[in-house]
Structure formats: structure tokens, C-alpha cells
Amino acid sequence: MTVLPALPPLDDLETLNVHLETLSAENRVCWALQHAPDHPALSSSFGAQSAVMLHLLTRFAPDIPVILVDTGYLFPETYRFADTLTERLKLNLKVYQPLRSGTWTEARHGRLWEQGIDGINQYNTLHKVEPMRRALEELQVGTWFTGLRRGQSSTRTQTSIVQRRDERYKISPIVDWTDRDIWEYMKHHDLPYHPLWEQGYVSIGDIHTTRPLEPDMREEDTRFFGFKRECGIHENI
């Protein structure tokens, strides 16, 4: 692993982020693995371009836990894609599910995703946020790697490379990457896009709240019927 020159300490996030902006994604990962808190983990939706972060992290930390929140409503293609990448990259996959099944949730609350923004928020809390929070706590994650990028939506344009949430640090090594950067990395390393990419799906979540991109649509409008882009994981954890 590359040994990097001294950077500002973690308690000076503003200055640290300025320095990290000058480093490559690979060196940002190396820095975090050397200097951020113990018990790192990577979360992945196994979405359209997820192979990039999975490949990047496992180059330097082959056994890093990879957290997948299985909401119970993922596309069949997503489950198969997760199997494919897990086998190819020898991932240390940790699958977390909601405390109650989708059938149970529907029996109690109906189809929450059809109940406007309040229903969508409640669904996301039960099926996404709670399992992710539980995963981070059970795995005692001190450093949480994500594949967030500023260009993905208007809600992510100000995302920093390093953020602090209580005692946990969230690291987004490719936050400044463009779609072109993603494509070049995937081409160079012969990595696959999600199978639904070729059908126009650019952001892939649950079956009932994901749409393919259509003319005059923003990428963020393909999720949650255009009500919102974020599922709550990166807003609330």
C-alpha cells in the first residue's frame, strides 16, 4: 500500500478535505485505510456503476466487509449481479435485511411507496435506513466507504471526501469523478455495468420506485417518482 505524506488530522476536516481533493481516488483510499478509524466497511447497492468502488476498495483491502441492504424488493438482475461481482472480486459480502418482511410491512401499512412522499419516507426508514444503521453498528464500523459522487444529483453537489457522523467517518473517494471517469475506470479494468444499464436504467434501487431514464428527465427523477433522490441512508446516517 502506498505510504502517503502527512496530511492534516481528522479533527481538522476542512483543511484535510482541501488536501484530499488533490489526491487520486486510489491515494484517498490508502490514506483512509492508514489514518481513519478501525473497522472499515464499504456499502454498495450493486447498482449501475457499483463495480467501480467494489474493485477500487478490494484492491487495497481485499477482505473489507461489503454491506448490501436487501430490501426484499430489488430487481432479480441486482441479485444476480451481486452474485457475479461477489464471485469475481471475492467479496466479503454482508447482507442485511429489514426486521420485517415486505409482506408483513404491506399487511400493516399497505404499499407505502404508493402513499406519496410520507409513505416513501416511511418505507425507506423501514427497509433501507434501519438495516444500514444496524449493519454499521453490528460490524462496529469506524470508517464507512461510499460511492457517492457530486454529479449524481443536486443533493450531492456539496459532498466532501471525508465527513464525520458522531464517531464514525464517511469516506467518498470518487466524489469528484464524472461519468467519463467511471467509464474509463470500468473499461481499463474490464468491469461490468449492471445488466439493466443497457435498458436505460441509470440509478437502480427497488423495482417499484425505479424507472429507466427518458428524454428530458434528470437522472435523479428516475427514483421515487421524482419526489426525491435520496433514500435516507446518506441523509440520516
From Swiss-Prot:
E.C. code: 1.8.4.8
Top-rank taxon, per record: Bacteria
Gene: cysH
GO molecular function: phosphoadenylyl-sulfate reductase (thioredoxin) activity
Catalytic reactions on record: [thioredoxin]-disulfide + sulfite + adenosine 3',5'-bisphosphate + 2 H(+) = [thioredoxin]-dithiol + 3'-phosphoadenylyl sulfate
GO CC annotation: cytoplasm
PANTHER family reported in the protein's UniProt record: PHOSPHOADENOSINE PHOSPHOSULFATE REDUCTASE
Name this protein carries in UniProt: Phosphoadenosine 5'-phosphosulfate reductase
SUPFAM superfamilies xrefs: Adenine nucleotide alpha hydrolases-like (SSF52402)
Keywords carried by this UniProt record: Cytoplasm, Oxidoreductase
Taxon lineage: Bacteria, Pseudomonadati, Pseudomonadota, Gammaproteobacteria, Lysobacterales
InterPro entries: PAPS/APS_Rdtase (IPR004511), PAPS_reduct_dom (IPR002500), PAPS_reductase_CysH (IPR011800), Rossmann-like_a/b/a_fold (IPR014729)
Oxidoreductase listed as a keyword: yes
Pathway: Sulfur metabolism; hydrogen sulfide biosynthesis; sulfite from sulfate: step 3/3
Enzyme class: oxidoreductase
Compartments where located: Cytoplasm
Species of origin: Xylella fastidiosa (strain M12)
Chain's role: Catalyzes the formation of sulfite from phosphoadenosine 5'-phosphosulfate (PAPS) using thioredoxin as an electron donor.
Homology family: Belongs to the PAPS reductase family. CysH subfamily.
Active site per the UniProt annotation: 231
Main location: cytoplasm
GO biological process, one term: hydrogen sulfide biosynthetic process
Keyword Oxidoreductase: yes
Pfam assignment, any one: PAPS_reduct
CDD domains per the UniProt record, alphabetical: PAPS_reductase (cd23945)
